[in-house]
């Protein structure tokens, strides 16, 4: 059986999801096709085309729309109000959030005590859940949204200067905002989840955003191939295969 897969979002031309997931599926002996599809409105697109695909990876601006369109959602979707994966089972759609897994797995080999999150969107909510044990602080340009997250997740709203001094600084900021806001030396580790842009120097260490892309994709492949969040064989080797595919796609 050849599965038909796609990644949806806008803009989508830069997405490396097809390359990394097809490389992993080939390594696992699975057959699939994987498309990039420009979609701005999931509610409009899904009824017309959704039944043609076995699973759909979702990026911005669709993650917040998916929860309301699925027949069932996992606990992480409920906690984050964000879904980045839709799995079709018979005539129903199941929504999942694998961003939480992608975030935590990317940072797993690092040591840190304090965590700060920059941003207030869907990815920031996933980071809140992924690092909830560390009671993360938050900074956002939109103070109203930042205060809403503070109330929803019990985090602490802080000034930018304080956030940048954390052991682990997770940036979910769009565009060049992070470059515009930084420019000094910082004591911690920067985890910039956006992989398609240059990240600022000045931090003591760096977690590339491509690592999150790969680990959240491994989370999606777990669901695609097992129906649940069950680990796949030798995921460390699978990560290396996917990282190589991402580098070749540059």
Language model regions located:
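ADP-ribose/adenylate-binding Rossmann-like module
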Residues: 79-85, 171-175, 182-213
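Active-site capping/gating segments
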Residues: 105-106, 205-245
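Glycine-rich adenosine-cofactor-binding loop
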Residues: 9, 97-100, 107-133, 139-143
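Phosphate/diphosphate ligand-binding glycine-rich loop within oxidoreductases
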Residues: 2-110, 197, 202
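Short, charged/polar "capping" segments at the starts of alpha-helices
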Residues: 15, 65-66, 143-149, 176-181, ...
